Amino acid sequence: MFDEARAKAIIEELLVSMGVDGQVEVGTFNDQVYFNISSRDHALLIGRGGESLRSLQYIVNLLLKHNIKDAPFVVVDVAGYKKERNDKIARFAEEAAAKAVNTAKEVRLKPMNSYERRIVHMRLAENPEVVTASEGDEPHRTIVVKKRP
């Protein structure tokens, strides 16, 4: 059984070592353990386009794997940024699907990181009217949404 209290304490220790004052809440998100950090320094923790947050999540998962036997992958969020971003990406995906179906033309989304592309692919996999494909190379990899033939 995963010790969420111990994991929370490890994250809090990391924040202290970073000189960040913050509170950590534990929950679930998309069937994963979810830690949301509330802090006045949220912009610093999120970074431009979520880059700092992705790095923070990576470091937290390394620390948990090192300190807690059989620690699962956990989601780390700051001020609900990821939840809001996921909802926004899902809306973009739905809008692109509607446009592809209505115009019968492919719709190319802006470049996204692999996590964001996965959200689009998973969301539109449920739509029987469209197909999706990733194209290009990082960091300019994008998704093309097409009406299903």
Predicted region positions:
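RNA-contacting regions in translation and RNA-metabolism proteins
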Residues: 1-149
